[in-house]
Amino acid sequence: MSRKKTPKSKGGSVPAASTLPAAANGPRLAHPRTARPGPEAPPNGPPQSGRPSLGGTGDFYDVAFKVMLVGDSGVGKTCLLVRFKDGAFLAGTFISTVGIDFRNKVLDVDGMKVKLQIWDTAGQERFRSVTHAYYRDAHALLLLYDITNKDSFDNIQAWLTEIQEYAQQDVVLMLLGNKVDSTQERVVKREDGEKLAKEYGLPFMETSAKSGLNVDLAFTAIAKELKQRSTKAPSEPRFRLHDYVKREGRGVSCCRL
C-alpha cells in the first residue's frame, strides 16, 4: 500500500458509513437532512485523496479522517485535543477558542497509518454559523460535556439536534463526560451520562484532559471504527465500537492522576 505524506493543503475525504441514531426512549430527532452547503475549507483543511503533498511534516499516512470536537464553551475541548496531540495539559486561565482550529495526529491502527485531522470548534453561540459549515464533511464527532457543569449536560440534546441537521447521516458520534478529575465539583452523575448515551445509541466514556484518563482511548476507538469502515474485507470480523469502549475503559479509576 502506497503511503501519502501529510499535506498542508485542503482535499477530499475517505467515506464512512453509519447512522446517527435517534433516541430510543426520548424525543425522536427528525430524519437527517442533507448537509447544507458551506464555504470551502481553508488552505489547511481536510486532506483529499489523490492530492500530492505540498509540504512536509514528516507524517506519512495511509488514510485520513476529519474529526470534530463539539460541545458548550468551557467543557475542555481544546485541553482534550492538546492532551491527545502533545501529551500536555493546558493549566491556568481559561481562554475560549475563537472560531475553529485544528491539529493532525497519525496513529498506527492495526498496521495501518491513520491520520486524524482534529478540528476544535468554538462553543459560543456567535460562532455556530461558522461551525455548521464544517459538519458536512466530518467523519466523526466527539460531543463533550463538563461533569461539573449541569448546563453543558442539559444542552447535549440541543447539540444532537444540530448534529442531526448539519452533519452527514453516516457520521460516527461518541459522547464524552469530561473533567472527571474534578470529583469534588461533580454535578452530573456517570449514570446520567450512560443513560443519555443509551437513549441515543452512542458509545460513552468519561475523560480527563488533566490526568489523560481515557483520552487516547476515545481517539483510538474512533480511528479503529473509521479505519475498518474504509478498508474492511468481506472476511474480516466487524469492529464493534461500543464493545471496544466498554472493554477497554472498564475498571479504570477516574481518580488516577
From Swiss-Prot:
- The answer, when asked if Membrane is one of the entry's keywords, is yes
Which biological process annotations from GO are given for this protein? exocrine system development; Golgi to plasma membrane protein transport; regulated exocytosis; regulation of exocytosis; regulation protein catabolic process at presynapse; vesicle-mediated transport
Q: Which residues bind GTP?
A: 73-79, 96-97, 123, 178-179, 181, 209-210
Q: Subunit structure of this entry?
A: Interacts with ADRA2B. Interacts with RIMS1.
Highest taxon above the source species: Eukaryota
What lineage, starting at the top, does this entry show?
A: Eukaryota, Metazoa, Chordata, Craniata, Vertebrata
Lipid-attached positions, S-geranylgeranyl cysteine = C254, C255
Q: What class of enzyme is it?
A: hydrolase
Motif range (Switch 1): 87-102
Question: What's the protein name?
Answer: Ras-related protein Rab-26
The function of this protein is: The small GTPases Rab are key regulators of intracellular membrane trafficking, from the formation of transport vesicles to their fusion with membranes. Rabs cycle between an inactive GDP-bound form and an active GTP-bound form that is able to recruit to membranes different set of downstream effectors directly responsible for vesicle formation, movement, tethering and fusion. RAB26 mediates transport of ADRA2A and ADRA2B from the Golgi to the cell membrane. Plays a role in the maturation of zymogenic granules and in pepsinogen secretion in the stomach.
Q: Which Pfam families match?
A: Ras
Q: Which residues bind Mg(2+)?
A: T78, T97, D120
The regulatory note on its activity is:
Regulated by guanine nucleotide exchange factors (GEFs) which promote the exchange of bound GDP for free GTP. Regulated by GTPase activating proteins (GAPs) which increase the GTP hydrolysis activity. Inhibited by GDP dissociation inhibitors (GDIs).
One of the entry's Gene Ontology molecular-function terms is:
GTPase activity
Example of a GO cellular component annotation carried by this entry:
Golgi membrane
Cofactor(s) listed: Mg(2+)
Source organism of this protein record: Rattus norvegicus
**Topological category with respect to the lipid bilayer:** Lipid-anchor
Q: Where is this region: Disordered?
A: 1-53
Q: In which tissues is it expressed?
A: Expressed in pancreas, kidney, brain, submandibular gland, and lung.
Q: Per the record, what are the reactions this protein catalyses?
A: GTP + H2O = GDP + phosphate + H(+)
Recorded family membership: Belongs to the small GTPase superfamily. Rab family.
Concerning CDD domains, the annotation shows: Rab26 (cd04112)
Cellular localisation: Cytoplasmic vesicle, Secretory vesicle membrane; Golgi apparatus membrane
Q: Does the keyword Lipoprotein apply?
A: yes
Domain-level remarks: Switch 1, switch 2 and the interswitch regions are characteristic of Rab GTPases and mediate the interactions with Rab downstream effectors. The switch regions undergo conformational changes upon nucleotide binding which drive interaction with specific sets of effector proteins, with most effectors only binding to GTP-bound Rab.
Q: Where does this protein chiefly localize? A: membrane
